[in-house]
């Protein structure tokens, strides 16, 4: 019943316009969750007399438990063993399965700063708003955002980052490598990071995804229900948070002789850019400007019959492209 209620919460957009239904759903969730915990407690917890209705086994051996403390120690040791790549992010605002409305607002502000002020120290966040504590614990302390040359940038975990963070980055890299064969759902990536041995909380996943998309900006294509998303923005991330299953990512890398051709195209399209912006052009350095160009054309240009054959074919190919 609890799983069904969570499904309704995630997949019923009509709730956004029905405050009464939202209150009823929250009340039902609270009641069912409390009932579940009480029943689990009666089954699992040793009684005051030291008896237990359960027999506990770990690694094939029975563990005798005579107290609640003993059970807690066992569960703690089991969790440490199973989730051995869980990072120790000390931020109770966002390192949670469900975040509060105020924490969600701070996370939104942080993601907006990540997108708009990536090259600035502390992402241009001044003072001590809640998003600054999120930044310090999740991005700065791990080295995911650090100085790279004259500017700040998103990077792989730093040398001082804990092993768990390095393992998470490798898992994300393996996922992206697999996506080269075809787009993979963002919800699949989130499910991977929630499972053992990582055990990440859902609250931090959008922030980690933002790091990945911004670090691999010219290599990862983002799709919304099969349609290419040319610009990663804060509103897009708000939709990802609500419906990650509607989004997919694909890593796009070109090697060999074709890479030379793509580099030439990229140089032509970025002829007005600075030298820094023209370093190591990638496939998406071409795709994004072309996509933006075609979507911004006046309607009469897209419907006229006066275009040359090659120009018409290019427009049609870009419009109909799914990858």
Segments predicted by a language model, with ranges:
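Extended alpha-helical scaffold and adjacent linker segments that couple domains
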Residues: 1-323
């Amino acid at each position: 019943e609890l799983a069904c209620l969570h499904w309704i919460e995630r997949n019923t957009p009509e709730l956004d316009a029905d405050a009464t239904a939202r209150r009823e759903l929250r009340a039902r969730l609270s009641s069912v969750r409390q009932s579940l915990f009480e029943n689990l407690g009666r089954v699992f917890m040793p009684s005051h007399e030291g008896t237990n209705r359960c027999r506990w086994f770990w690694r094939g051996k029975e563990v005798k438990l005579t107290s609640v403390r003993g059970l807690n120690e066992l569960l703690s040791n089991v969790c440490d063993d199973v989730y051995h790549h869980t990072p120790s992010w000390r931020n109770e605002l966002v390192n949670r399965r469900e975040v509060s409305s105020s924490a969600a607002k701070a996370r939104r502000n942080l993601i907006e700063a990540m997108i708009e002020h990536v090259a600035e120290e502390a992402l241009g966040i001044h003072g001590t708003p809640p998003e600054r504590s999120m930044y310090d614990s999740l991005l700065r302390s791990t080295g995911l955002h650090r100085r790279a040359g004259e500017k700040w940038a998103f990077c792989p975990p730093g040398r001082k980052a804990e092993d768990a963070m390095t393992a998470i980055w490798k898992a994300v890299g393996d996922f992206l490598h697999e996506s080269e064969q075809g787009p993979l759902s963002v919800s699949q990536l989130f499910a991977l990071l929630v499972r053992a041995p990582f055990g990440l909380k859902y609250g931090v996943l959008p922030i980690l995804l933002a790091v990945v998309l911004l670090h691999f900006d010219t290599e990862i294509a983002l799709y919304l229900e099969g349609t290419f998303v040319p610009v990663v923005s804060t509103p897009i991330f708000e939709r990802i948070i609500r419906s990650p299953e509607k989004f997919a990512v694909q890593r796009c890398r070109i090697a060999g002789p074709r890479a030379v051709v793509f580099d030439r195209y990229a140089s032509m399209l970025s002829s007005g850019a600075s030298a820094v912006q023209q370093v190591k052009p990638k496939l998406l350095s071409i795709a994004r400007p072309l996509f933006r160009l075609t979507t911004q054309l006046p309607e009469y240009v897209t419907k006229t019959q006066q275009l040359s054959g090659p120009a018409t074919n290019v427009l049609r190919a870009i419009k109909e492209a799914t990858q």
